[in-house]
Each structure stands twice: as C-alpha cells, then as structure tokens.
Amino acid sequence: MDLININGVRLEVKHVAARPAGVQGSTGLAPLVFLHEGLGSVAMWRDWPTQLCTATGREGWVYSRRGYGQSDAVPDVRGASAVVNGQRTGRLLPDYLHEEAWTVLPALVKTLKLENPVLVGHSDGGSIALLHASRFPVSACVVMAPHVMVEDVSIKSIRQARTAFEAGDLRQRLARYHADVNCAFWQWNDVWLSDAFRSFDIRDNCRTIAAPLLAMQGVDDVYGTMRQIEEIPVYRRQNKHFPTSYIDSMLYKLEQCGHSPHRDQTELTTQLIAEFLAGVS
C-alpha cells in the first residue's frame, strides 16, 4: 500500500502497470484513473482494474478517497460541518462530489504527474468523473451507474443500506475494506439522506464536457434508473486526434445488471470500455 499527501490528507493509492502480452515499456496511451463508488475503496475494486488495464494496454491508478479504505479518516464524521486548518471536518456537505472533482482530483493528477487521463468512475465516482471532465482536460470519461440527479429509488435504497448497516451484516462486510468503517459508511449515508442533498443535479455541468464519453447503466440497478445516463447531454464531438473524424459519446443499457457493471457483467463491461478506448490516445 502506498500513501500520498494531497492537500494535507494521506490518500491510499495503487499503481497498476498491467500491459498486454508481448508489450514492453510504456504504451504512450493516457492512463486510467479509477474513481470508486460511495462505499468503495482500492480493495473493493478487486482485480478488475488490472483486467481493464490489460485489455486496454494502459497503466492505471486507483485511489481511496478520504475516509475510505486506508486513507485518512474524516474527523468527527457525524458532527457539524467545519473547516479546520484548511481541511473539512464533520458531516459531508452537499457539494462533496464537486469538491472531490474540482479540488482533490486535480491535485492528485498533478502529484502523480498524469496528463489528460482517462477517468473510469463508478456510482459516486462516476459523478466525480463527469464533474471533473466538465472543467479539466481528460482524454476520455467512462462512467458506470453515475448519479447526475437524485431519484426516489436512490433514497429508498440508501435508507435500506442504513438499516442493513445498523441491524444487518453490512457493517461487518464493509469492515474488510475500510480502516474506519464507521467513517466510510456514515459520511456517505448521512449526506445522501440529508434534505439539502435532494437538489443535487449536475446535468448542466455535463453540457461542458468536451471529451469522449461512455456511460453504462444496469437495468436492475436499485440505486438509479436509466434516466441517470439518458439525461446526460450527449453531443457528436470532433475527434481532436483525427480532425476529419468524430467520436460519438455512447450510452449503454446493460441487461441482467445491477448497480455494479464491472462485477455483474464483467466481461461485457471490460469489452465495451476496451472497444470505446481503442480510438482514444
């Protein structure tokens, strides 16, 4: 495990150097940066980042956000929101995804000396990827089950997750992946169930994304409907690498798939992303 200091917070990072068979050294392709779900971490991705890096011929970087995995915890995670010595403490604010996308992720990309990475985001990580791509240069943006707005089905499932954490085995299962499981769970659950978060909506932000975009949504996702990707504004954009051709943004509806395409439909998800990125440097 490696830890890097980003704006005074130690974040867990993992470098994936997988390459296709027979390839030596760098491929020169933009690296993948993996952005995990609301209860995720480096470890919860398991070996899928390695699978995708191998399939695409790209190196990858995986990191755990503050309060997740082995990264620093958030002090007083259920207390009043505050800023102490330049760091946020207490409950997450409704703009926590914006903060991660526009402050933390740019600093991490700079620290790792990455240039125009390909973002691969799942759930909350998908929202972060979209927000980051709306303001910062990326080679492409791949999102799985992103949240672009709040739906009733999302709130219902997050309430059920709270019950499972307090009275079921969810806490025990999550504890395998997080140094501070209470911090990991409550920072996510509290903000999502707050009244202030109901107005979360990033559809307008998505209009300024200039990079190729691939969005996937499972039809059986209990945290969101197909609207989450259908309402991402999609345009036909000129391919900067080939001025006479175009890369279309793509939306995929995945059958027999829940909230985690990379786990529920691993082979298909990996194939779709690899094919999409084949035209991206």
Language-model segments: residues:
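Conserved HGGG/HGGXW glycine-rich cap/lid loop of the alpha/beta-hydrolase fold
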Residues: 18-76
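Active-site loop/oxyanion-hole signature of alpha/beta-hydrolase fold enzymes
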Residues: 62-116
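Conserved hydrolase catalytic core segment
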Residues: 115-151
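Active-site nucleophile elbow and catalytic-triad environment of alpha/beta-hydrolase enzymes
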Residues: 188-205
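Short beta-strand/loop motif that positions the catalytic acidic residue
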Residues: 209, 215-217
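Short alpha-helix in the alpha/beta-hydrolase fold that links the catalytic acid
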Residues: 211, 225-235
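Acidic catalytic loop of the alpha/beta-hydrolase fold
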Residues: 219-224
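Catalytic histidine-centered segment of alpha/beta-hydrolase-like enzymes
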Residues: 257-270
